[in-house]
């Protein structure tokens, strides 16, 4: 899926944190809208990325701007949803499910926080920054911001909410009833994405360091 650019690059856009002047996306002829614009990463036998090792696309024995390629895209191939309301005797169950398939995201949280150089290890006051456990896998000494390694599969299936209830008929008399229910918002998401949340804004660049909350609610409806 890697394609070498023609002489006209296209519209290069969308900056990233940690790398001033680097734009990570491109709109170009013959490529999907909002493709990522990166160097094609090379890997060792164990499947780990090799620092500074990229495919020399034009064969000139150096890695530079001419080796950047359009790679993957931020838009999904398929977006779907499913809602349902089920009931059995006094029980009722409802849920809302969504899926986004074929979309990718640039994990800027990892690319900006994995390297072991001073600028990524310490803040401006000299204190250690929070480290990502993934830094032990890449072991990059300096930031590899333009690596295709950070363009990750962000397809997902998310349960937005699910609710289970039970209705007590004839609570005190024939005219009174009560329904007890429990609802969970954002109970789970199924994804291969390494970041906190695969559901990225339209830019396709993930700078999210805060998890989406999971909310539990217990309710009671009374009918008189």
Question: Which stretches of residues belong to each language-model region?
Answer:
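Extracytoplasmic gating/loop element in the C-terminal half of outer-membrane beta-barrel translocons
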Residues: 19, 31-36, 43-48, 100-185
């Amino acid at each position: 899926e890697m394609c070498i650019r023609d002489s006209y690059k296209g519209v290069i856009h969308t900056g990233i944190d940690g790398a001033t002047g680097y734009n990570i996306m491109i709109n170009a002829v013959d490529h999907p809208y909002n493709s990522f614009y990166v160097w094609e990463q090379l890997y060792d036998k164990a499947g780990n990325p090799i620092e500074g090792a990229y495919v020399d696309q034009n064969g000139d024995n150096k890695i530079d701007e001419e080796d950047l390629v359009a790679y993957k895209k931020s838009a999904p191939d398929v977006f779907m949803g499913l809602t349902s309301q089920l009931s059995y005797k006094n029980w009722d169950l409802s849920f809302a499910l969504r899926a986004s398939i074929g979309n990718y995201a640039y994990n800027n949280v990892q690319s900006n926080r994995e390297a072991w150089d001073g600028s990524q290890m310490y803040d401006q006051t000299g204190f250690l920054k929070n480290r990502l456990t993934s830094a032990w896998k890449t072991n990059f000494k300096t930031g590899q911001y333009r690596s295709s390694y950070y363009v990750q599969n962000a397809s997902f299936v998310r349960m937005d909410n699910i609710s289970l209830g039970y209705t007590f008929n004839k609570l005190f008399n024939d005219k009174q009833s009560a329904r007890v229910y429990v609802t969970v918002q954002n109970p789970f998401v199924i994804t291969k994405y390494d970041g906190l949340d695969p559901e990225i804004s339209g830019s396709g660049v993930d700078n999210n360091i805060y998890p989406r909350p999971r909310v539990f609610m217990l309710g009671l409806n009374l009918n008189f």
